[in-house]
Amino acid sequence: MKHIVKNIHFVGIGGAGMSGIAEVLLNLGYKVSGSDVGNNAATRRLASLGATVMHGHDAANVSGANAVVVSTAVSGDNPEVLAARSQRIPVVPRAVMLAELMRLKQGVAIAGTHGKTTTTSLVASVLAEGGLDPTFVIGGRLNSAGANARLGTGDFIVAEADESDASFLNLFPVIEVITNIDADHMDTYGHDFARLKQAFIEFTQRLPFYGIAVLCVDDPNVREILPFVSKPVVRYGFAEDAQIRAVDARAVDGQMHFTVLRQLNGHTEPPLEIVLNLPGLHNVQNALAAIAIATELEVPDAAIVKALREFHGVGRRFQRYGEVATPDGAGTFTLVDDYGHHPVEMAATLAAARGAFPERRLVLAFQPHRFTRTRDCFEDFVKVLGTVDALLLSEVYAAGEAPIVAADGRALTRALRVAGKVEPVFVEQMEEMPQAILNAVRPGDVVVTMGAGSIGGVPGQLVSHQQALQGSQA
């Protein structure tokens, strides 16, 4: 590719999926430019690495580009996309560019409705500890690396495979993981769940004859597609027929302790005693996927154990901000932030919080993400939001969608009041959320901020507020 394409421009370069690919291309020696309406940590990092980052979209930004990369979040009438097409500059979907990177190495693609980012991070961390020095492209910041992408010298590239727009069907990896299959992004599949499952079956057909599909058989929908997967399979989970199986899982001080039984290629491997530096049974499953891949690639057991014990987590995936003082100075509350925005993953995260912090009041500040998701999962949202002890609920983060009156934040608030499990506090503007949290907390509470939108900035504001308070008292 490099002898033809030297200058690559990204429309929406600050996005989680785009910035990682841009960073790897920078490290490969390409000249990278990009535009974004916002200025975030990803754009600042890319600029520091040598990318030309422009704020706002303008037709002039694509001047000199040999290719323009876009995500599905970028509309077809974007001025940069229109300019590229008029100048016959190739407009390349993000997944197609990721597929090009995968052609340079052996691809490990992590798919599934929930858990992709954490599982990708765990796989990358275990392979790195095993000396395989993988390249990785992750949808969140891997805390140990300080970035969501890295160019390694090894044979493997580990990346998330996105089913939301069916773009994962562009990838041709040698190892695939499917963590679970759930009803999300159903507009892509004509609101037909059978079509979504068929897409995952087609994803496994992208594997070569020597490839491996690593499947979580705890998930009933993954189990349903199992008979239709024609490539070699490694089953993982808590289920008795899992080849990579966790037993005796228990929560200890915010970590998960468990034993892994392994049956691969007709051989019984020695059991592994694992301490995972993450809470929750769902993260045990995510770790099992990493263990399955590492075992297949003959990573030493000691490296697997060490990587999972010392895993530093991923930004906005049960990210702990520590203790924050209550406004009255009578004590502190524990602050945790999470990207969860679908009822299934929210339930898993809240269960993990209960396990990590037993017998403590759980306060959730939640920003729904997309009106269509809120509409499609409305009753499930009401159910999961009703499990917390106190709830602050904001308006839906639109993500470019038009409002749906019966599926907005106020509609959710009314439904929760009718259900009677929790009395929600509706917070109209996200700027008001930090103060609303401070008004609601008591000493000893666990506060979880959750959502895929602008609520991600709230924990930093709470920490800054505390630091300013401490400075004024010094």
Swiss-Prot record:
It catalyses: UDP-N-acetyl-alpha-D-muramate + L-alanine + ATP = UDP-N-acetyl-alpha-D-muramoyl-L-alanine + ADP + phosphate + H(+). GO terms for cellular component: cytoplasm. Pathway: Cell wall biogenesis; peptidoglycan biosynthesis. Gene3D superfamilies: Mur ligase, C-terminal domain, Mur-like, catalytic domain, NAD(P)-binding Rossmann-like Domain. One of its GO terms (molecular function) is ATP binding. GO terms for biological process: cell division; cell wall organization; peptidoglycan biosynthetic process; regulation of cell shape. ATP binds at residues 112-118. It is an enzyme of class 6 (ligase). Its main location: cytoplasm. Keywords: ATP-binding, Cell cycle, Cell division, Cell shape, Cell wall biogenesis/degradation, Cytoplasm, Ligase, Nucleotide-binding, Peptidoglycan synthesis. Cell wall formation. Belongs to the MurCDEF family. This is UDP-N-acetylmuramate--L-alanine ligase.
